[in-house]
C-alpha cells in the first residue's frame, strides 16, 4: 500500500561540489548491485533524528548503466524542515542510511525527436542521468542550465567537458538569462521540453512553451516540493480507529509514519496522486499544497494529499 521497500546503504563518498551543495555516493552495505533505474528516477532517503522520521526525495544523477552505486546531490536550503540540513551536518562517508527503490515520474520519452532540457540550480540533477542515458542511445538533446554563479552551480565543467556544445550555461551574476523563446522557437516538430528547478522557473517555462504553441503532451516538469510548516492539528482515522497529532513541522504522512501507520505514498511531493485520501469531516480550511488535485477537487474539500497538505487548526477525519 505504501511506498516501496527500504534498502540499507552506506555512504561511500560525501563531498561539497558547490556552495551549499553536497554530493553523496551510496553503495549497498553488502556491496551487492543496487536496483536498476532509468534516467530521471529518484529515491526517497530515510533520515532519523531523535524521534523524528524524515523522508526526502532526491534525483539519481549517476549513470543508469552502473548500479554499483547511486549518486545524489543535496542542496542545504534556508527553509529546510530538517532533511537537507541533516544530510549536510550529520551524514558523512561511512554513515548508513535507508533508501526506497527508484521511482521515475520524470522519464525522457524515447519517442521524442529531440529533448530540450531546462534546468535551474539544483534542478540539474535529474538531467544528469537522463543525458547519460540518451547519450548512450545516440538521441538528440540539448541542455540550458541557469545558475546564480559558478560558485553556486554544480557540475558545469563536468557537463561541458562531456557533452560540449549541447550544454549551455547562463550565469545570473553575469546578467545572462536563458533565451527561452528563442530556444523553443528553433526546435523541430516532435521535440519535447523538460524543466526542473524553482517553481517560478517551471511556471515561466511551461507558460512560454504553451504561448509558442507547444502541445501540452510535449511538456514535462518536475519539482520536489516540501510541505510548508503550520500549527499542530488532529487527524482522526476512521478505519484504524486512531487519532494522532500532526506537529507543526510535520506533514500528515510523516505523522502517520512516526506512529507506525501504513499510508499510501510514492513521490512525497504532491505530484503523483498516490496519497490522495478521502476527507470524511473537517473542522477547518484545508491548505492544499499539492500539484495534483484540480481546483474543483480542492474546493470540494473531499480529498487531501497527505504528503503535502494540512489544515490550519482543529481536526480532520480521514478514510484511513
Predicted features, each with a name:
Residues 2-96, 147-149:
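Ferredoxin-reductase
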Residues 48, 102-103, 280:
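Short, surface-exposed secondary-structure boundary micro-motifs
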Residues 236-259, 278-289:
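Short, charged low-complexity linear segments at domain edges
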Residues 173-175, 247, 309-320:
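Short flanking/linker segments adjacent to small metal-binding domains or redox-active Cys/His motifs
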Residues 126, 261-285, 296-313:
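Local cysteine-cluster metal-coordination motifs and their immediate loop/turn environment
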Residues 2-3, 85-241, 245:
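FNR/FR-type flavoprotein reductase catalytic core
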Amino acid at each position: 500500500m505504501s511506498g516501496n521497500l527500504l534498502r540499507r546503504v552506506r555512504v561511500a563518498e560525501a563531498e561539497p561540489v558547490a556552495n551549499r551543495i553536497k554530493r553523496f555516493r551510496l553503495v549497498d552495505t553488502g556491496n551487492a548491485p543496487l536496483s536498476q533505474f532509468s534516467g530521471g528516477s529518484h529515491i526517497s532517503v530515510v533520515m532519523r533524528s531523535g524521534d523524528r522520521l524524515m523522508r526526502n526525495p532526491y534525483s539519481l544523477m549517476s549513470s543508469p548503466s552502473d548500479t554499483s552505486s547511486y549518486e545524489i546531490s543535496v542542496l542545504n536550503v534556508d527553509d529546510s524542515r530538517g532533511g537537507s540540513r541533516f544530510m549536510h551536518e550529520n551524514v558523512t562517508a561511512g554513515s548508513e542510511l535507508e533508501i526506497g527503490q527508484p521511482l521515475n515520474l520524470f522519464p525522457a520519452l524515447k519517442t521524442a525527436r529531440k529533448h530540450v532540457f531546462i534546468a535551474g540550480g539544483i534542478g540539474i540533477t535529474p538531467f544528469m542521468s537522463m543525458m547519460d542515458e540518451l547519450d548512450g542511445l545516440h538521441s538528440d538533446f540539448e541542455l540550458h542550465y541557469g545558475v546564480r554563479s559558478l560558485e553556486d552551480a554544480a557540475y558545469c565543467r563536468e557537463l561541458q567537458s562531456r557533452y560540449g556544445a549541447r550544454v549551455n550555461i547562463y550565469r545570473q551574476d553575469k546578467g545572462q538569462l536563458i533565451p527561452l523563446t528563442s530556444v523553443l522557437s528553433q526546435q523541430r516538430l516532435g521535440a519535447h521540453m523538460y524543466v526542473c528547478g524553482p517553481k517560478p522557473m517551471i511556471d515561466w517555462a511551461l507558460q512560454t512553451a504553451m504561448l509558442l504553441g507547444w502541445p501540452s503532451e510535449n511538456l514535462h516538469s518536475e519539482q520536489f516540493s516540501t510541505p510548508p510548516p503550520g500549527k499542530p492539528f488532529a487527524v482522526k482515522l476512521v478505519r484504524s480507529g486512531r487519532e494522532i497529532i500532526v506537529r507543526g513541522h510535520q506533514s500528515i504522512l510523516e505523522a502517520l509514519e512516526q506512529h507506525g501507520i501504513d499510508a499510501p505514498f510514492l513521490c512525497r511531493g504532491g505530484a503523483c496522486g498516490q496519497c490522495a485520501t478521502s476527507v470524511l469531516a473537517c473542522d477547518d480550511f484545508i491548505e492544499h499544497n499539492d500539484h495534483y488535485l484540480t481546483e474543483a477537487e480542492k474546493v470540494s474539500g473531499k480529498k487531501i494529499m497527505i504528503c503535502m497538505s494540512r489544515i490550519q487548526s482543529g481536526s480532520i477525519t480521514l478514510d484511513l
